[in-house]
Regions:
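Short, charge-rich amphipathic segments
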Residues: 12-23, 67-76, 116
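Core catalytic region of metal-dependent phosphoesterases/phosphodiesterases
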Residues: 1-59
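Membrane-proximal helix-turn-helix segments that form the acceptor-binding/catalytic region
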Residues: 19, 113, 134
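A broad, low-specificity signal for short, low-complexity segments enriched in glycine/proline
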Residues: 13-14, 22-30, 106-110, 125-130, ...
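Short, surface-exposed linear patches
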Residues: 12-15, 51-53, 73, 86-90, ...
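Short C-terminal domain-edge/linker segments immediately following a structured domain
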Residues: 20-25, 59-63, 94-101
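Active-site-proximal loop/helix segment associated with metal-binding centers of metalloenzymes
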Residues: 69-130
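Conserved beta-sheet core of the metallophosphoesterase superfamily
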Residues: 46-53, 63-65, 70, 75-82, ...
Length: 168
């Protein structure tokens, strides 16, 4: 969560390192993911460029479709409901009333509990994965050479039906 006047302990050095890169002319891009739902303007204040997903960009004559990956493709009803709650302005306001110590403990506990409850690495479901389905549909309307996403925290390299590379 992004408070107006508080930077979470342990992250200042990361922000300082990113700022040092930007001071040397390196552009730093940021995609909001499922753990970053409540970031607002702080990254832009630091000089980062926030991109909405999916972002189409041309690099070296090739077209890339890049994004975090969260929420792209067909999403199960339960997850859609949860995403709706996290994107709700009233709930965001109510959460902002919590002291940062409480809010960060809740957020970190939720995140850690979610990861630890699986007890194993995520196994990508191939062509039945919602993100892959998104890419297969997206390339029907846009010429794309490479899809690059995160979100699943696993390594995937495969081809889409249209021949683009699909990387997670």
């Amino acid at each position: 969560y992004e408070y107006r006047d508080v930077v979470p302990k342990g992250y200042v050095r990361v922000f300082a390192a990113l700022t040092a890169l930007m001071d040397r002319g390196v552009k730093v891009y940021f995609f909001q993911g499922n753990h970053d739902v409540w970031t607002y303007s702080y990254f832009e204040e630091l000089g980062m460029i926030r991109l909405e997903q999916p972002a189409l960009m041309e690099i070296g004559g090739k077209t890339f479709c890049i994004g975090h990956g969260d929420g792209l493709g067909p999403v199960p009803m339960g997850y859609r409901f949860l995403r709706g709650m996290f994107h709700n302005r009233v709930l965001q306001f109510l959460f902002s009333l919590l002291h940062p110590w409480i809010a960060f403990r809740l957020g970190n506990g939720w995140s850690r509990g979610n990861r630890l409850s699986r007890h194993e690495e995520y196994v990508f479901k191939g062509e039945s994965e919602p993100l892959y389905k998104f890419a297969a549909e997206f390339e029907k309307k846009h010429k794309v050479d490479h899809f690059i996403f995160g979100h699943y925290h696993c390594e995937v390299d495969m081809k889409t039906p249209g021949g683009a590379t699909f990387h997670v």
